[in-house]
Amino acid sequence: MFLFTNGKVLWGAVIAAFILSIVFYPFLPTQMPIHYDVANSPDLTVNKLAGTVMLPVLMVVFAWARKINWQFVFAVYILLICHIVVLCLAL
């Protein structure tokens, strides 16, 4: 339960997502694939800047919303995992 009750760990995860975006940014293609079809070929792409900033910004929103409902903490960690997967698949 430490991950869910400690605000420092939560904001550390948000900061880690932004750091990952900054580190991976020069290595990413101009268009990042964010969805794949059944044949494992990308069928939806976004701009590199949008792809690296979109999920960390959502993490900030959910981290602030945890004051309203503690279940938003789960969303922050799930978005961190999704962000890591998207960055790795885009390389």
From Swiss-Prot:
Membrane topology: Multi-pass membrane protein
Keywords: Cell membrane, Membrane, Transmembrane, Transmembrane helix
Primary location group: membrane
Origin: domain of life: Bacteria
Location(s) in or outside the cell: Cell membrane
Induction cue: Expression controlled by a sigma-Y-regulated promoter which needs the sigma-Y factor for the binding of the RNA polymerase and subsequent transcription.
Keyword Cell membrane among UniProt keywords: yes
Parts of the chain that traverse the membrane: 9-29, 44-64, 71-91
Any Gene Ontology CC annotation: plasma membrane
Signal peptide range in chain numbering: none
Protein name (record): Uncharacterized membrane protein YbgB
Organism: Bacillus subtilis (strain 168)
Upper taxonomic lineage: Bacteria, Bacillati, Bacillota, Bacilli, Bacillales
